[in-house]
Amino acid sequence: MNQSFVFNYGKLVASNLDSDALRLVRADKGLLIWVNLFAPTPEEATSILEDVFSFHPLAIEDCLAVSRYPKIEDYEDYLYLVMHAVAFNKEDQFRTTELDLFIGKSFLVTHHSEPLASVTSTIERIQKNPSSIARGMDRLAHFLLDTMVDAYQPVLNDLTNEIGALEDTVFLSREPEPTVIREFRERKKELSDLQQIVRPQRDVANRLARGEFKLIRPVLLPYFRDLLGNLNRIETTAATLHDQLYMTLDVFLNKASYETNEVIKVLTLLTAVTTPTLLIGTWYGMNLKMPEYEMKYAYPIAIAIDLVTTIGMVVWLKRKRWL
């Protein structure tokens, strides 16, 4: 499916045009066009990307393929960007969605395979008040990216709450659930995925903010610097959460190790205390005739030796403060 919006001096003058109409609009340099491709068929993608806009084959190939890492490429007449939105789905699973952008002087083409809240909110903004963001394709692209980055905050809040709950489980529970390690692994993967896309996105924003590309007007540079600042803050928060997660993991492992050592200590002490009795029982349990068996008080003496050695072992362990 594709949506198209045509602007003239900040006003929305047409929408949802077919490929032939878009070619005619492209010929009028006074009009601005935004085409949004949402999960297009191969025919729709080819019609727009190749036939209408004549983008470079390598850029089209990258656009239609899945890319894990954000990037920006300059094709002189337009910029090609790969960015990623993040969210939690209905099953509370962290996921990322790729957004491809072709930014030209008079056009913006976006492509994504899944619904994006930033695109939806931008379309709603255009339909209500297009003049605020539709006076330039660089401004429209910034609004899209800024809205997308703003959506990172709820994800960070969810991750913060999940790691906080994990901390409570580790610090407050006498015996943490066996699922703790699985929770650690899932949170670690989510944070790693987030950091893998935030770092290169920050680099993309940095290049946009420092005026490297002629298609980004100087008046927009402060806005892209603000976008860069937001990404820096997100990266810092993600790094802090990553450290917090590993600190909690260290506490959990130390706690588990301590509890294991306590169990081993108890078993070792039991073994030490009962060793004299076991030795005596083993010695006199041999199937041999011993002179002691003929003694009148052999049995009471054996019991007494057992008790004395056991009590002596307990006293010795207490003096060593091992018990």
Give, region by region, the residue ranges found by the protein language model.
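Hydrophobic alpha-helical transmembrane segments and their immediately adjacent juxtamembrane loops
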Residues: 229-323
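Peripheral, non-transmembrane regulatory/ligand-interaction domains of membrane transport proteins
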Residues: 1-219, 223-240, 292, 322-323
